[in-house]
């Protein structure tokens, strides 16, 4: 894989929980880049994707079908996704060689919804480093609905930190689909990300409210 100046294009891995909007971001990024006349290479590494709305230069579904993995190994969707990730990682060099000859300014990679594949599986770490070739970073997408509670927001902070720690790549957190949130909710979430004291207070309040709810239920 080489860009127009002969160097390896930087690689941007899009990571996040299922439904956070990874494929939507890749689609929008590709359209935005084309508008600016930037040559972006979109890569799909999700073998379980039913459809994508971007134009992938490489699609892992051409190598591995999640439904075939489920049938062959008698696995459910989650187990098949994990095994499929291991199978893709075992072919990481072959995948890299297939996209190596593509010229572009940047490569953006759509990843499976199971964020634990990046947080806890060595296979995904191997795949990321082979494809990244030392010129990679991560975008971790925060789900807007999960982010609307202090505990949900912190849970995603922890997941992002684990992925960053495991892969050792520069990581940026972004709140996805923020247009779905009410303005006051969006403002509150952004404040949590900027002021840990405010976030801590919100966590204590949430915990106290939950304790009161549980206690009330027990008395009933």
Enumerate the language-model features and the residues they cover:
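Nucleotide-state-sensitive switch-loop elements of NTP-binding domains
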Residues: 2-15, 20-137
């Amino acid at each position: 894989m080489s860009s127009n100046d002969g160097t390896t294009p930087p690689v941007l891995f899009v990571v996040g929980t299922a439904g956070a909007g990874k494929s939507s971001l890749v689609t929008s990024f590709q359209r935005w880049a084309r508008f600016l006349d930037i040559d972006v290479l979109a890569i799909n590494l999700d073998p379980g994707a039913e459809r994508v709305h971007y134009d992938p230069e490489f699609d892992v579904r051409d190598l591995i079908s999640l439904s075939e993995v489920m049938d062959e190994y008698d696995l459910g969707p989650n187990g098949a996704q994990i095994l499929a990730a291991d199978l893709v990682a075992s072919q990481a060099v072959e995948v890299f060689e297939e996209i190596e000859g593509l010229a572009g300014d940047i490569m953006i990679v759509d990843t499976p919804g199971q964020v634990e594949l990046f947080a806890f599986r060595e296979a995904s770490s191997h795949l990321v480093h082979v494809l990244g070739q030392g010129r990679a970073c991560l975008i971790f997408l925060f789900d807007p609905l999960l982010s609307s509670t202090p505990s949900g927001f912190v849970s995603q902070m922890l997941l992002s930190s684990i992925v960053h720690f495991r892969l050792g790549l520069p990581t940026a957190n972004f709140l996805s689909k923020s247009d779905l949130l009410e303005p006051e909710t969006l403002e509150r979430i952004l404040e949590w990300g900027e002021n840990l004291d405010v976030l801590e207070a919100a966590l204590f309040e949430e915990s106290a409210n939950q304790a009161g709810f549980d206690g009330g239920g027990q008395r009933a």
